[in-house]
Amino acid sequence: MKKYVCTVCGYEYDPAEGDPDNGVKPGTAFEDVPADWVCPICGAPKSEFEPA
């Protein structure tokens, strides 16, 4: 699974880790992250992420 990076702040979404503090379980591919999920650092929408 590919990692994705927030183009606003540089936060890296790692599918192996997910974002459990915000309801995304480890092992969740970026494509399967809910559409309303936002960057946990800066609040940017999912659309601001690109493949690492």
From Swiss-Prot:
Its cofactor is Fe(3+). GO terms for cellular component: cytoplasm. Residues 1-52 form the Rubredoxin-like domain. Disulfide bonds: none annotated. It is found in: Cytoplasm. The modification N-formylmethionine is found at residue 1. PROSITE patterns: RUBREDOXIN, RUBREDOXIN_LIKE. Rubredoxin is a small nonheme, iron protein lacking acid-labile sulfide. Its single Fe, chelated to 4 Cys, functions as an electron acceptor and may also stabilize the conformation of the molecule. Belongs to the rubredoxin family. Monomer. NCBIfam families: RubredRD. This is Rubredoxin.
